[in-house]
Amino acid sequence: MPGDRGALSSPAASSGSPSAAPSGIAACPPPPSPLARASPQASGPRRGASVPQKLAETLSSQYGLNVFVAGLLFLLAWAVHATGVGKSDLLCVLTALMLLQLLWMLWYVGRSYMQRRLIRPKDTHAGARWLRGSITLFAFITIVLGCLKVAYFIGFSECLSATEGVFPVTHAVHTLLQVYFLWGHAKDIIMSFKTLERFGVIHSVFTNLLLWANSVLNESKHQLNEHKERLITLGFGNITIVLDDHTPQCNCTPPALCSALSHGIYYLYPFNIEYQILASTMLYVLWKNIGRRVDSSRHQKMQCRFDGVLVGSVLGLTVLAATIAVVVVYMIHIGRSKSKSESALIMFYLYAITVLLLMGAAGLVGSWIYRVDEKSLDESKNPARKLDADLLVATASGSWLLSWGSILAIACAETRPPYTWYNLPYSVLVIVEKYVQNIFIIESVHLEPEGVPEDVRTLRVVTVCSGEAAALAASSLGSQGTAQDGSPAVNGNLHLQQRCEKEDQEADWEGATGTTRCLDFLQGGMKRRLLRNITAFLFLCNISLWIPPAFGCRPEYDNGLEEIVFGFEPWIIVVNLAMPFSIFYRMHAAAALFEVYCKI
């Protein structure tokens, strides 16, 4: 009956009928009225609900910064031999901070075990398995380092305080529990006891940063002493050189064993340094995730496949083998005589220039492929990904500082040794290569995975609604499409998609014939193989460039030009501040590139 048909169609008309939409455009439900938005029954979150949590975040971050600043002052006081501050005082402070973190982790693990049956939200991007595997490897070497320190303490027990034996034991226990904690809870999104947990997590972050700073200081003092000994051997009488010797004032039995332990400790410090900074970054992501609402979008599991990367792997392994050979020759020749030192520096600069040129070219090719491919970006909020990008740029600043210092020293020097003209292109390439590599990595981690469904991508482009209406339109389109295949809304949506694709094709045909040919060449498997080879090569090269500065091959110390221009003490301070960030950059870039490889 006509009357019945009109009665049935009136609700659809009041809610926005598809047939009432303009031709060719998907209909959108009307936006909610202001009265509905202001009603108490509205499902939106209250504005004042997040104020206490924002206050807790601010308070906890300020607490952590105060702990860190106070700890840094203790480290500085010990480093400059301040009156009344000895090594035992510093170790007591660090031990107390570790014990406090241990208590919090035990409480958190125990409470999580009691609530193990509850379903908790997880951040699938945080604490990747390969990342936890890396931190486990570094933690194992850190425990070995602690064992060597305990053996060293036993050898010199007559003149060392008890804190120097307690500290490595506490650190070993702290390392074991922290690795267990990160394996089990790095993905947690804490939704209860949020204020207390913020303080516990941020305390853990800055405790690890202080342990990192302590390791960096010990390793830097050792490297500086070796550099001063080389200068004494080479006869630099115009520089006041005082060795900062912390050797105990008593005999060790047997002496040969104690000497071997002392040298072994400093060779393991680079791994301990990487462990502490890696743990602090994982804990920082956990802190940022407290109270966070998880994105309900489907997470694509990354599967790493190692087929089809023969070229990149062979080139990378060749660079790695050459790096080990260069470091061995450098450490043997440097400081033996003036001619041998200059030849060692020239060898290192030639090696580094070659590697940096290859890495820069690989990064440019990878970025060019992304420009040609024009894939959409994943703009969802991700604390782990944002931290990775921020750390890449921040830690690259350490190398940039050293490189610009070398360039300025070359420009201002009155006399220039032969290796100066190798140092100049090396310094320029360090700046350019990290600039290019950062762009490649950051763009790679922000690209959408290959497995994103096509209908999801189409919906992002085709939907013409705004605000809350967009989500309602998406759901209504899905339900109408299943109910009746010939729905005007669906047909209009497809018509709009076809029109957009036609316009894009016309634009591409007018101005990008060459780009289309590149796209034809780089379709599917060819593009992925090329990107994987580039990423594998850059991954191995970053590990290779981590080795020389981590194990004492530091031309910034040994070429002497910067020390003459800036002065010995000022330049040494700059190197000691910038070098830890430069070393960490290479390992962090390698970790980010591994994630990129698994994503491609």
UniProtKB/Swiss-Prot annotation:
TM ranges: 57-78, 87-110, 129-151, 162-186, 195-221, 263-288, 310-332, 343-368, 387-411, 422-442, 533-551, 570-593
Catalytic activity: H(+)(in) = H(+)(out)
Major subcellular site: membrane
Keywords in alphabetical order: Biomineralization, Cell membrane, Cell projection, Hydrogen ion transport, Ion channel, Ion transport, Membrane, Transmembrane, Transmembrane helix, Transport
Topological domain spans for side Extracellular: 79-86, 152-161, 222-262, 333-342, 412-421, 552-569
Biased composition (Low complexity): 7-27
Cross-referenced InterPro entries: Otopetrin
Subcellular location: Cell membrane; Cell projection, Microvillus
Protein name according to UniProt: Proton channel OTOP1
Species for this entry: Rattus norvegicus
